C-alpha cells in the first residue's frame, strides 16, 4: 500500500515585513527626537531592545520594548484599521502661519523657523516637537495643521486621503471664467499635469480673513481655488500659467478644517467634528499596496 502523505504541521505566523516598523520611526515617536536625531542615537549604540543594541534600518514590532540611554521608551498607540481610530489619539492643531515663516526646523536661510514662530504660544520645548502636515512656502500664509505625532503626518498629507487644500489668491487683474476653466481642466507644469478641483471668484460667504474682507484690494482681485495635493508652489505656478501672478496667497481650508477667525500666529486645537471628519477621510482612503517582490534569477 502506498504510504499516506503526511501534512506538514502548520507554521506559526511570523510578522511580515509590512507589519514591522523602522526602529528610527519608533524611537522618534516615543522620545520626541527628530528622525535624524533617532538615527544618530541608534548609530551611537544608545538604543537597545531586549538587552541588545538595535541597528540602523532594523524593523521591529510596534510594541517592541525600547530603551534610550538606559531609560524605557513607552510605546504609543498607533492607528488601527480594526478600531477605525486612524489618528490614534494624536493632538492636531490649526495654526495661522504668518508670512515670512519657513515651515522647517532648521534652515540657514530662514528668517523665522517653525519652532521659533510657535515658541510664544507653546514654549520652546513643545514647539521644537511640532511637525507640519504639509507645508506652506515662506511667502504664503494661512492654515497649517500641526502635530507632535510623526506617524499621522504622512497619512494626512498624502493625496489619497482626499483632503482638499483651499486657498484665496489675490492677483493684479481679475481672473475670468475662461481662465478658471483652464485651471479646472488642467495645465501641464514642469513636473506634470495639475488641475484645480474648484476655481472661481470669491463669494460673499467664503471663509476669508477679516483683513481680506476690509482690505485695500478690490474684491474682484481675489479668487478661490482648491487642489487635492501639495506640490511645490503648485497654486502659484497654476496662476502663473494663466498669466495672473499671485500677489498674496492664503490657505483657508485643509479638508474639513477651516481657518475661521484665526489671525496670524494664532493656533487652536481642531474641534471634535473636524477630528471625526479627518478620521473618516483616513479610513476611506485607499491603502497603498505592497510592491511585489521580484523573483530571484536562477
Which functions belong to the PLM regions below?
Residues 6-298:
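Basic, flexible Lys/Arg- and Gly-enriched helix-loop patches that mediate nucleic-acid binding at interfaces
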Residues 2-4:
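BZIP DNA-binding basic region
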